């Protein structure tokens, strides 16, 4: 067992982390995390619902009726992703020994530079700083000067900005950032009685920039869509950081002797999600946005997912109230079991052996959980979590979104399931986080702690091991009722 100095304990306490949590993390480094036991990859008819075209309007009507009630609907947008990875090829060009574009990527970038949404503002910067337009600089062979003004702080600083604040989309006479596209989307499907609630999770160093951007553009979109925006921001809590260790599993220390903590990954956001108060929450990543001309599908299928969620939640609440009242017979219990198995895809081997109070307790426990409906698209080789039927610690089988790291690569059946999976999850979720009495669930209670992930990293040339928390839409929502609905690829545009 590791002995922490008073200074260590002070550092741990300042982060809001308990010593017992640190000790548990150190144990997890030693033991590792178990792979999940799988039953099958989900497919249409086996865990994935394919809604007939004629039924889509029924669910959209349900959603529109729901919005007319006294409800709070919120768009929750993980937006801390840095843009630096998007520009790795341009950073490589800046440090290359040659000055003119040579690779296919570099040639394509410069020959199409006018098509980028940031072109006009970059051109303006080049004229102000160099007295030359982008094209004049290129004609002089100053390609790196153009890239320098794009990526670094002397110009637009895109290499240091988050993706949400880059000009992504070009329209006639204007351009939009992903942050703005989410404002537009919110008005189109998450507008409840003229109010649109959005919550962006951002990194601390960029919070002011996001706030400035919203304050700058909000009025324009409020006028355009005749809505009022309520926009809030949060950052990952320091208490969700995880301790880093050396290869021998002893705590890694910085050069000043202090412990090294690292962000716990997107799974840390379950705490942020737990802090927002809403009846229905749409979750979609910041960079998954489409131009207006393609938004019709996005809006239609977001409303479809929400309608499916409202339909299933209404039925689950009805059954929970019945179970609570005691006014049911055996046929009703069989009906509830069918709903749990056929609609929520939650199976318990040997359920027929449960009787009376034991069966009622089981049904209550499984129905009285947060619920999410996830859009899944046909697999075209994009990276993303896969929809699976997986075993839970209580022996039940339910739907989960799994990443490749959660699957045992030495199990040929499992790797075949993963590689031959028909669908993937593009992080397109609609969530219900309140119970049938209208009280909020405490979301950390529904996390499967055994689904974390250990990765190898380095700092200052020294190897270390890092611990990632169960992913937000993976293990952090493991104990939710999960439903998959097929949506078209046109709704996914990272």
Residue ranges and their predicted role:
Residues 2-44, 362-367, 372-373, 380, ...:
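Long, compositionally biased intrinsically disordered regions
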Residues 132-140, 287, 302-341, 418-494:
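Conserved catalytic alpha/beta cores of large enzymes that bind or transform nucleotide phosphates
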Residues 10-13, 31-34, 38-380, 384-385, ...:
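Domain-scale recognition of functional cores that engage charged ligands
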Residues 88-89, 244, 293-295, 413, ...:
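Short conserved micro-motifs at the rims of enzyme active sites and ligand-binding pockets
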Residues 183-187, 411-414, 469:
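Short amphipathic beta-strand starts and helix->beta connectors
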Residues 281, 391-426, 435, 451-455:
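C-terminal, active-site-flanking charged/polar segments
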Residues 206, 381, 408, 435-437, ...:
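Residues that cap or initiate secondary-structure elements
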